[in-house]
Amino acid sequence: MISPRVNTRVWQRSISLLSPQAAKTESNVVTKERTYIENLSKDIATSRFRLVDENGKIASITVQPDIPICIKKDCLVSIHNLNHLSLSYKWLNFWSNLIKFRSFKSSLFHRIIGSSVLEILAAPNFQISRRPFDSSRSLSVLNLTGTKDWNVFGKDSIIAFEQNSSLEIKSPIFPSARSLVSNSSKSQLPRKFQILNGRGNVLVCGGGLVYSIELIDECDKILVNSRNILAINGQSQLDIANSVERQELHVEGAYVGDSSNDTVAPKFIKNQTLKSAYGHTVQFFKRMRSWIRNQYEKRYIYGVDSYFMKIKGPRTILIQTHEMTTSKDNILTKLTSKSHVKKSTVNDNGVNLEKQVANDVNSKIIELANRPSLFIATVSQDGRVDFQSTSKFT
């Protein structure tokens, strides 16, 4: 069960979203900074990571001299103060990430070193599924002092980190033996995560908005959708494994009812063997119907794409909203895909209709993408495509 205290915090957060000026009550849900600070020691000269805007779209990184900083490919925006600047690349957990995420791009980082203080801007400009940067992604900063471990989920979650002798980023392929024997199989975390431990700064990225929720004690629990968890911390990997319990939403089986009368064979069946076979056959089809209905409700009504994790404190978790976006690229891809273009034919003028249709559609892409309203496309026999706004038909 989720404690009333967590419900109160989440409800207060929902009020602050609607009316930010009216909600003055302090909450454990971090909104602006979205930065988990662990009282970094003053005698440690490290880099400084901070978010430039409240939406977390871009981050500023102040790098001390001769301290390497690693930034994910395509995420570097700008560098200020270019005195004796050195740029190279670094593969982070190449083989483990390749096996786990089936992608080598998640391991490629640009390594930057300067002889003076550098001011760097970084943003999540990497491509996802062959599509350009998704503006719904936002950043969050983790400041580690070595007292706790962080598990960060997702192949593209780590955007930047400072490379020092203390900070360690691991990507285990198989769960550790200690986590396996800690509890039952229900306590296992999703396997696709990376472990952060030691001291240093790490810039992570999540879908939609990113919020930090603090669970105060062991009685403080929360139920989180597995797709929405970005990171979780703990005293050790064993502590994190023991704090998470996997819970799936079970669908109640369909009520079959009293089938004692239904399995009775008709009077014209005299043979006892046939009567028994008839009863077993009827019962089999009833159970099969119940199973099909159960699977249908589980897959199409309740959904099986995700499961829930019950997490108990004390610890801090990062939640990503995973805002659902209806990208215009999906519509444009369907319009220009080969399946929507007929085979090449030649008209009376010898013009290739397929190329003409493709060129006509491409000429309207910019206009179509910049207008939020709906359009009606009219395709004439000669291959011309005419787009008209629905406002003209009202």
Swiss-Prot record:
Coiled coil: none
Annotated transit peptide: 1-111
InterPro entries: AIM24, AIM24_sf
Sorted UniProt keywords: Mitochondrion, Transit peptide
GO cellular component assignments: mitochondrial inner membrane
Keyword Transit peptide belongs to the record: yes
Signal peptide extent: none
GO biological process, one term: inner mitochondrial membrane organization
PANTHER family: ALTERED INHERITANCE OF MITOCHONDRIA PROTEIN 24, MITOCHONDRIAL
Family: Belongs to the AIM24 family.
Protein name: Altered inheritance of mitochondria protein 24, mitochondrial
Organism name: Saccharomyces cerevisiae (strain YJM789) (Baker's yeast)
Lineage, uppermost ranks: Eukaryota, Fungi, Dikarya, Ascomycota, Saccharomycotina
